Amino acid sequence: VQNILMKNLTDVCVGTISWWAFGWMFAYGPIEGLTKFAGNTEYFGHGFMTETSVGVIVPTDKPRDWFFQWAFCSAAATIVSGGIAERVNFPGYFFYTLWMTCIIYPVVVAWTWSGNGWLQGGTEQNINDVGYVDFAGSGIVHMCGGVGALVGAAVVGARTGRWDPEREGEFDPHSLPLIVLGTFILWFGWDG
């Protein structure tokens, strides 16, 4: 349990800094130049404030959007922690989180959600046009996290010393009250 909790905390802490520094830029920054690979401006929060004609600096809506999208980014990174639980050391997981929240997830978002990406062509109204349609992150968030967990589990292999081939059975949960509390928190978060 401590291993997974520490990895989830790492996802949030490292993910916040890397999403702020470069992730947002790759995902939602304006794409300048000939490529539609990923955004290449607005790193380190540039573009979150703007100057008016009278020289007053005022906030834009981007910090709100940044926070909302950061939550999706952290969720995608956290999905992997269950797939490689108790098998990856902390420095290895730290660099995975940095890579996922700074490069992998933002580039996938740039291709699909940003409005500038090469997969952004189809909409629900125009289904014959080739493009990507996603509902609430089902493809982007969960696919990035799921593929990351699959690759991670394949690379690190099975847990040693945890499985007994002679005795098959289910593991008892660590704390049933915490499982129920977590379920209620998820329900509350989903319902608003």
What positions do the PLM features span?
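Hydrophobic alpha-helical transmembrane bundles of multi-pass membrane proteins
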Residues: 1-192
